[in-house]
Amino acid sequence: MGGGELIGTVRVVNAVQPNDDLWSGPTHDFSFPVEAGHVLAFLRAIGETDPQTVAPPTFAAATDHFDPHYLRRPPRGSGWGNGLPESNLHVEQHFDYARPVQVGETLTARKGPGRRWSKTGRSGALQFVEERTELRDSDGDAVVVMRWVDVHAERSHADLTKAQLDRVRVVLPPGAVVVAEQLSRTQFVMYAGASGDFHPLHHDEDLARRHGYPSVFAPGMLTMALTARALTDLVGHERLRSFGGRFRSQVWPGDTLHAIVTEHGATDRPDAAGSAFTVTTYNQNGGLVFEATATTR
């Protein structure tokens, strides 16, 4: 976890500003048009039905559609015949917001490698790699900073999946609200189409089984987007300053997801005045699939 300090159990992020010191390698820039139809497709993929003038909190992930170097898109003319895109374990995702993304604007994305670090865990040596994306408006002002964190583990991604399936389940905590009911493969595909993440492990059943998985599974970012609905239902879009968390377990076809949003009171930093929250998401068996923190203005 990075980008701020802990207040209790909640991380309060610093102001959103582009920072050249946070890149660990070359970056590239490209345009990100925020089109009404694209936002509506994203909304429908996460269970919303009404058009909105602001994009959902995790819509910035859809920059992948416009990134000319994005790797989780089938190569033209060969599909995945030359092998799958690199499949590391997506363990964390973080968004810092200066303001909501507005339908109709065109942003400039700068994308590249961020921080790198290592540690030793129960599954062996772990190498963490951060991908950083900064979105700026036509005035050059920061709008959103997004950080995707992968881990390279000694154990395979499929082996780690089996370990997750073997975890002991707990009773679903009280106060949870349903954010998705009996997720289907169709919804996985809807999200892939809206977000631009076409990794075949999320939609190609035969391929997933050949690579050691029990079935296709939901993109982690779909779980996060569904969780964000519970947060914005409570605090709205305009107040949101940060939203980030860790993926604890995969989500499978047929799962129903429940989220709990807990407010922890006001933050005590003058440059981050607002409220701090934790957000946890569970499946129908009480298994923790995602846990996050958020702050508001």
Locations of regions flagged by a protein language model:
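Residue-level signal for alpha-helical context at structural boundaries
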Residues: 129, 206-209, 245
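Hot-dog-fold acyl-thioester-processing enzymes
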Residues: 6-92, 157-239
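Mid-chain, well-packed structural core segment of small domains
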Residues: 84, 234-244, 251-253, 259
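Phosphate-handling active-site elements
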Residues: 119, 233-240, 268-269
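HotDog/MaoC-like acyl-thioester-processing domains
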Residues: 4-22, 27, 92-93, 97-180, ...
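Short, glycine/charge-rich beta-strand/loop segments that flank catalytic centers
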Residues: 54-56, 245-249
